[in-house]
Amino acid sequence: MWGRLLLWPLVLGFSLSGGTQTPSVYDESGSTGGGDDSTPSILPAPRGYPGQVCANDSDTLELPDSSRALLLGWVPTRLVPALYGLVLVVGLPANGLALWVLATQAPRLPSTMLLMNLAAADLLLALALPPRIAYHLRGQRWPFGEAACRLATAALYGHMYGSVLLLAAVSLDRYLALVHPLRARALRGRRLALGLCMAAWLMAAALALPLTLQRQTFRLARSDRVLCHDALPLDAQASHWQPAFTCLALLGCFLPLLAMLLCYGATLHTLAASGRRYGHALRLTAVVLASAVAFFVPSNLLLLLHYSDPSPSAWGNLYGAYVPSLALSTLNSCVDPFIYYYVSAEFRDKVRAGLFQRSPGDTVASKASAEGGSRGMGTHSSLLQ
């Protein structure tokens, strides 16, 4: 069921490409801005809905009827804010609690540093969503101004791709610990963990920076709506947005996912060759890898399809499918805490001890149970911490 849910934006995108395609000539009254009836030049397929700047008002964009219908439909105004709301309701407390426990209860290990940064990235992603939820629920009306729009866009993408990069760092740490345990004693130090965290944050910041350099708020023609990032002028696509989002998809998603595939592939092979006593760790590693691929590949594949053909009508309104697929990608921040932290009996015991101020003597039984489970699967919690 989850697989179908995550793949439906791709199906929607291909159905849009065969049906309501973006026309190369706007047939709406005044949409070409003035008396020039010539066909607009073919530009690269746009990141957002293709907007034509009105000749007498540079703050207003005219959209084709097909794009306008998708922009104002139930998917962006109801489904997308519902998905973002789920991330906020589940991801905020789950990641906040996990970060608190990791910072106050967990041992100061290099792997703990990586998991703390992952929890922080997922937490910041959830905190970046309320303005976008308000925007979509208000029927695509952005009330916060241009600067806030740029910051909200950069925060959404920066923290999401920062999470992907940190997931890759965690996979490398797990690879060293399980595939090269002897070498890991020398390599898996605080210096390596700190370097991986700094590299992930700096890369995420560099990828998000171009999202703050171009104007992103425009008024929708024949309405009172001010759009944030959802409709952008065609002439800005090839020069700015195409390279910016191509780099985001390739460097922020597919390259880290490739690293995760290689690291977790080797980890799975090592666990499988070790015997049945690693069965739980084997299944958990497979779930971690599958969730990352399932949540991030559809939206980033749609993003690259935008720029795979020079004609704006080649793929139709793929952006209409990209918006919900992006919202689905943010759901990964809700899943991370449960497959990286709360799956561990030892971590759950630390949560209970922290919440209810239980002394170590009160948790002997639960710790003994966790240790017994660890012996049965080759250190249950060590796979995560």
Swiss-Prot record:
Keywords from the UniProt entry: Blood coagulation, Cell membrane, Disulfide bond, G-protein coupled receptor, Glycoprotein, Hemostasis, Membrane, Receptor, Signal, Transducer, Transmembrane, Transmembrane helix
Keyword Chloroplast: no
Expression across tissues: Widely expressed, with highest levels in lung, pancreas, thyroid, testis and small intestine. Not expressed in brain, kidney, spinal cord and peripheral blood leukocytes. Also detected in platelets.
Family: Belongs to the G-protein coupled receptor 1 family.
InterPro entries per the UniProt record, alphabetical: GPCR_Rhodpsn, GPCR_Rhodpsn_7TM, Prot_act_rcpt_4, Protea_act_rcpt
GO molecular function: G protein-coupled receptor activity; protease binding; thrombin-activated receptor activity
Post-translational modification: A proteolytic cleavage generates a new N-terminus that functions as a tethered ligand.
Protein's UniProt name: Proteinase-activated receptor 4
Any one GO BP annotation for this protein: platelet activation
Residue ranges that the UniProt entry lists as topological domain Extracellular: 48-82, 130-151, 214-247, 305-319
Cysteines paired by S-S bonds: 149-228
Cytoplasmic side: 104-108, 173-192, 269-283, 344-385
Site (Cleavage): 47-48
SUPFAM superfamilies documented for this protein: Family A G protein-coupled receptor-like
Region called Disordered, residue ranges: 21-42, 362-385
GO terms under cellular component: extracellular region; plasma membrane
